[in-house]
Amino acid sequence: MAERADLVFHNKVIDGAAMKRLISRLIDHFGMAYTSHILDQVKTLGFQQATATSISLGIDDLLTIPSKGWLVQDAEQQSLILEKHHHYGNVHAVEKLRQSIEIWYATSEYLRQEMNPNFRMTDPSNPVHLMSFSGARGNASQVHQLVGMRGLMSDPQGQMIDLPIQSNLREGLSLTEYIISCYGARKGVVDTAVRTSDAGYLTRRLVEVVQHIIVRRTDCGTIRSISVSPRNGVPERIFIQTLIGRVLADDIYIGPRCIAARNQDIGIGLVNRFISFRAQPIHIRTPFTCRSTSWICQLCYGRSPTHGDLVELGEAVGIIAGQSIGEPGTQLTLRTFHTGGVFTGGTAEHVRAPFNGKIKFNEDLVHPTRTRHGHPAFLCSIDLYVTIESQDIIHNVNIPPKSLILVQNDQYVESEQVIAEIRAGAATLNFKEKVRKHIYSESEGEMHWSTDVYHAPEYTYGNVHLLPKTSHLWILAVGTCRYSIVSFSLHKDQDQINAHSLSLEERYISDLSVTKDLARHQLFSSDSSSKKRGGTFDYARPDGSISNGHWNLQYPFILHENSDFLAKRRRNKFIIPLQYDQERDKELIPHFGVSIEIPINGILRRNSILAYFDDPRYRRNSSGITKYGAVEVDSILKKEDLIEYRGTKELSPKYQTKVDRFFFIPEEVHVLPGSSLIMVRNNSIIGVDTPLTLNIRSRVGGLVRVERKKKSIELKIFSGDIHFPGETDKISRHSGILIPPGTGKMTSKESKKLKNWIYVQRITPTKKKYFVSVRPVVTYEIADGINLATFFPKDLLQEGDNIQLRVVNYILYGNGKPIRGISHTSIQLVRTCLVLNWHQEEKSSIEDSHASFVEIKTNDLTCNFIRIELGKSPLLYTGKRNSVVSSGLINHNGLDYLNSNPFYSKAKIPSLTKQKGTGGTLLNGNKECQSLKILLSSNYSRIGPFNGLKYNTVTKQSIKADPVTPIRNCLGLLGTVVLKIANFYSSCHLITYNKTLLKKYFLIENLSQTFQGIIFFLIDENRGIYNLDPCSKTVFNPFDLNWRFFHHDYCDETSTLITLGQIFCENVCLFKYGSQKKSGQVIIVHVDYLVIRSAKPYLATPGATVHGHYGETLHEGDTLVTFIYEKSRSGDITQGLPKVEQVLEVRSIDSISTNLEKRVKAWNERISRILGNPWGFLISTELTIAQSRISLVNKIQKVYRSQGVQIHNRHLEIIVRQVTSKVLVSEDGMSNVFLPGELIGLLRAERAGRALDEAISYRAILLGITRASLNTQSFISEASFQETARVLAKAALRGRIDWLKGLKENVVLGGIIPVGTGFKKLVHHSRQHKNIHLEIKNKNLFEGKMRDILFHHREFLSSCIPNNFQ
């Protein structure tokens, strides 16, 4: 060694990496023993210097960064702008969350970067600054939380909390910040113990799987290998780590020169030569390529990680591998509490301007683009030099490629302004996961959307829809009666209602009738009559089912056969009575009745079905097939014409036959799960009450047909005779024909005449043999349908009225289609339908009719009706926008409203009779009736229809003097059908029920108010009708912040931009004097003002899931939409350790992109189908296992590397090899060797397949470490792991033998473990061992013959069929 005076003094700080290099060089030069003495001296020196320095830490040493104040203020300003955009509907909730996280993360990271320069400038010897580079708990992230800001926190599920902690631990936390800090940090002894025990349990399971893996041979002789190439995008560091310590499987050539030979171990020098020469792909030996799964050889394992030479014989490499994977998990568990749950995801890094100045860069090197948030930016494809010039300073910044420039050239920038965004590294961006986020409604209202939506495939009949493109979802403001079910009020559509006058009360209606107390309830009284007039009415939604404890009906309206028709009111309308007996509950709903079908919106198209009748004569309780013979059928109802019900659709097509007869061939059908054990054979003949499965017996006797499908088994029993035809029998040539009576039947040599129809079907169990099944047939004659016309009076159909009713019979099932009956239900074969039609007048364009259900109630008598009204709805409509429509005061020829119209109270009528109200005439398209709408200052109300009204003009001055809002020159307003059946002056009033909500209702106490139940329609300039919500049950309070009025004066040019029903966002400029302060929908367009209905927009992206129907009323907190988005996984080890466990246990996780189980199934199916047996099973299993092994290793390594933990691949490969070493015997090919569902080793399955004549069907399976621990060769090892009693009982029943080859079973029994020094005993040669060797040689001779047979397939396989070593 050189003299001390000759040594060079290196004044350099030695960190962890430098210390590693020093120790490595010392070992190379001086060896292990001398190096240990040197390291002892280094340790002593370190402790002496630390004692002499005596660094202490005080609270005054925590210096806050000066730039923190304006950084936090800038982030808050950005968050405020983001919140405004979200409120305007420009940014959806997920984007808002993501941008908010990125804003605060960038702020926190910039503070952390500013921390070290600040310390170096102000106090370089600060103890906190010195500790920030010591590692472990003393790192920059810890110090940043002390003097910077804690930033964003992760909750226990790994989700980011979007509210950041702006304070640091030096300043102290507020109450909210403290709660979030506790929520995110999740410190505590209990949690620490749980996490540590999880890592310990993982280690135990890993050791259980591989404890028997020992290095037993020097070379197994394999010629398999795994290819590693530096060219396929693998980072150089990972490439070096993969190669060092391995053994080459093939020679490496560069040109004609061999630079490395087979079975040579790879050192760092050889790896550097590979990298410098860029050699061809390198084939190495790994534990995957070793021939046996119960041990491993020296060359397949490679170098020992302890001393750098080839691993010694007898080394327990399995236990080393298990602990190498599990122990970092124990360490990393504690890292959670070092950083306190702070989010450290990968987001973009910002570049800020150092001072005020003008920025310059080469515009030719950038091209315009947008950021991921949609903001304009420039993208640079190569390195870009940006210059910032001030008066006396010039600053140059180098922007790396693929970064975004957020400012323009020659733009003036301020100090600390963000000028560029450097994209995050690929490693952090790749580590993502898919997350679902539910968005909830912030207010009560009706849901609308502005684009077409699709039904989600898994929710075809539900209310879940998918958005095909970006659009807005709107919640239109509405005040609903949450508990109201049936409203016993006087209000009609567009009547005004005062919501405060409603007292809500819950009651239970015991049956479908109204209670007598309600019938006697007097809702109002009129002064014009001495008799009290009682009545209630409401509007129906005939779209659901009634439930009253006794009945559940899909079609709630039943027509009795003894019903009497009342009367026909007008030409284009007729009324059908619905009567029922209130006393007899059991006879309330007849068993067979006529059902009325009316859509949700109440609109019946031409030739639509009004009612139908299910004849019990055409009802069957068994499955079967319908046949029409040779008669053609016409499908008269397409799919789009079917009647829809809420949540369900009647999808069975209806067929109208042209004959009077059809046939039903009965059969017994059982649909069983795919795993069911069937006790009968296909094409066998059984008797009645024969057991089919363990718990199912046949109801009839006959021929059994078994059809296996993907996930189920269909078992059919054909009753009838079996006929074995002769060569000349003509019947046997046909398959599936109907034979009429009177035809000869060949049963024997004699011919018998048939008395009934029969169905002949040809059965071919094999190619040569066949027989004929003769099955009985049930014949149905289609009689004329029930004459529904008898329910109506004669004058209805004989008066030459527009309306026509037609009776049509439908067969509900197609010709030859199988009919499957659900248990305990009957099958209806024929349905008799009443089809609605009407005469088409020359000038009329009536294409639909409106139907509704009404109930007239007088005294204690109640009558139900169906009202059908033809023609366009007399909706409220006016002409052009700028035309002047007569507007004036009401003077109905001195009519006293107070006495004649009971709809208005005394408080409201004087304002009309004193001629102070204002109204506008609103004409419908046909000008057959007029409707007058009046807006008062206190509420809304509507009068009409009236004929012959006279109007006087008024001036604007009188309007200003009176607090009545005018509707002069109204373009249109939201209105509904004018109910012609309502007689304002009669003693009875109408009521219909909301049939889906019969459990509760509310009662009106203050009867002097008028009320409004809104059912909306929109009319545009082209007279198009938009049905916004045909079945809503909503209540408006016009002055409860749901309506907004503003007066403005805009010119005619800009007025064309505003259309009725238009929905716009907040801050949109509607006219020249300013922007709209609140989002909403235009419901009235007037020359002087608009009426806006408040609305809340929600932006939704393509693929989002919308919950609910269009127009459905949502309450606050209801789920509105669900987003699916990708987010960066936070760099918290609590996300890593459970994921390692899930991968090793082979559980499917959403965040793993490729599901290995699906990949296994796909490989099995494709290759088995291409190659056939036995090669299909062999090759598909080999390729599947090889691919799955590599994928599993990569996924586990990805988790550990993301945490900075380096584990050699060979440890993972030993574990994964055991997880994938078993195959599952399938049920496709029944063999006499293995049972279906049995787990056997892959090598054993290949060996048995070669030795036997028949192929063994098996498929690859990924066990997981727990199942692999319970499926080993040693039952003692399994029993000591878990489920001891079950494992020992099964082993005793099977007579299993434990050969005590592993470590654990020898430890349990107190024997010498076969590793280390105990390994020599196993390799000691004796006579017995020689005999065994001879037997193995004989066996190998036999296998050599098999390999000669399979020789020509070697080129197809990546490796040849291996010999078996025991």
Swiss-Prot record:
InterPro entries: DNA-dir_RpoC2_beta_pp (IPR012756), RNA_pol_beta''_euk (IPR050254), RNA_pol_Rpb1_3_sf (IPR042102), RNA_pol_Rpb1_4 (IPR007083), RNA_pol_Rpb1_5 (IPR007081), Rpb1_funnel_sf (IPR038120). Coiled coil: none annotated. Its cofactor is Zn(2+). The keyword Nucleotide-binding does not apply. Its EC number is 2.7.7.6. Zn(2+) binds at C220, C290, C297, C300. It comes from the Eukaryota. The keyword Zinc applies. SUPFAM superfamilies: beta and beta-prime subunits of DNA dependent RNA-polymerase. It is found in: Plastid, Chloroplast. Keywords: Chloroplast, DNA-directed RNA polymerase, Metal-binding, Nucleotidyltransferase, Plastid, Transcription, Transferase, Zinc. It catalyses: RNA(n) + a ribonucleoside 5'-triphosphate = RNA(n+1) + diphosphate. Binds 1 Zn(2+) ion per subunit. Signal peptide: none annotated. CDD domains: RNAP_beta'_C. GO terms for molecular function: DNA binding; DNA-directed RNA polymerase activity; zinc ion binding. One of its GO terms (biological process) is DNA-templated transcription. Gene3D superfamilies: 1.10.132.30, 1.10.150.390, 1.10.1790.20, RNA polymerase Rpb1, domain 3. One of its GO terms (cellular component) is DNA-directed RNA polymerase complex. Pfam families: RNA_pol_Rpb1_4, RNA_pol_Rpb1_5. DNA-dependent RNA polymerase catalyzes the transcription of DNA into RNA using the four ribonucleoside triphosphates as substrates. In plastids the minimal PEP RNA polymerase catalytic core is composed of four subunits: alpha, beta, beta', and beta''. When a (nuclear-encoded) sigma factor is associated with the core the holoenzyme is formed, which can initiate transcription. HAMAP family: RNApol_bact_RpoC2. PANTHER family: DNA-DIRECTED RNA POLYMERASE SUBUNIT BETA. Belongs to the RNA polymerase beta' chain family. RpoC2 subfamily. This is DNA-directed RNA polymerase subunit beta''. The lineage of its organism: Eukaryota, Viridiplantae, Streptophyta, Embryophyta, Tracheophyta.
